[in-house]
């Protein structure tokens, strides 16, 4: 297996094995439901790829005709703990923690909820801390999987007895989502909004940044090419896929 032959030795600190030099960071990915965590190598080149792709997606905001007040707001990322585990030969943890560690000092003042709250592992406690801080922030973009972000906004609205999240964050104009299909959450999202906001889908995983939605009025994502990821495509037919849509062993 690839792990036993190659990846295991990279994790133990061996150089020039699966990638040139020594791989310092590994993202912990649960993979399929119920399976043990996998360590996904995160090279310095991958980190730069994530950063470049994020900037590319943010650069499309100018097409949304946003008010000037939006451009001095913060980005609130709702996710798992960013606390990293320092091992003898490497550092591992959630991808968000690895990327947080490499956030430019220029961007740090515009990101929320900050290092202390981001590092909290207890989800309920983290929500309580964000709810407490919410009135002090001017959030223009919220990012994260729908269930987490909507739950947070619902708790803020309920805690402060608001009509909508826009009563506390009037400059909230964009929601960047991913991880799951958004459509089942639209009705619930609309209940906490005071007005429509731009929705942008993204396909970001521990294995790489694969694509993002370029226009709010058009569904579908742009595949990110020339971005450090090798894509190989095969025809979607019965020769290559079984009746459940799973790739066959000898597909070509």
Regions found by a protein language model. Name each.
Residues 47-48, 72, 76, 160, ...:
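Residue-level signal for alpha-helical context at structural boundaries
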Residues 2-6, 79-93, 162, 182-187, ...:
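Short, charged low-complexity intrinsically disordered segments located at boundaries
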Residues 1-27, 37-41, 45, 49-50, ...:
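Active-site diphosphate/adenylate-binding microenvironment
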Residues 12, 100-252:
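Active-site glycine/GP-rich loop and adjacent strand/helix microenvironment
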